[in-house]
Amino acid sequence: MSTFDDRDNAFEAKFAHDQEKEFRAEMMALRQIAVWGVSLMQISPDEKEHRTAALQSLEMQKGAKALILAQLADDLSGDVDEDAIKTTYDLFLQDAREKLG
């Protein structure tokens, strides 16, 4: 194996590692935004638990971020605007990235 092949393999491994870290950070942020959004709702604790689980079940679907943020915007309409939800998600994502290194 040549030096070029070694470098190529190292770049591929780093890219895969970075992608996995970003995926994990996004999942952490989605879980946090679901909990945050539901905590703002004026519903019973049991209903909050159910809503949080329902939102978190969307995590693995294609377009999960858009689905979860849209659902929260709909559920919180009148209380929290869509920009505030997106800003809060971005803060959770930044925090998750920092935690993962």
Where do the protein language model's features map onto the residues?
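A charge-rich, low-complexity, intrinsically flexible signal that marks solvent-exposed coils, linkers
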Residues: 1-101
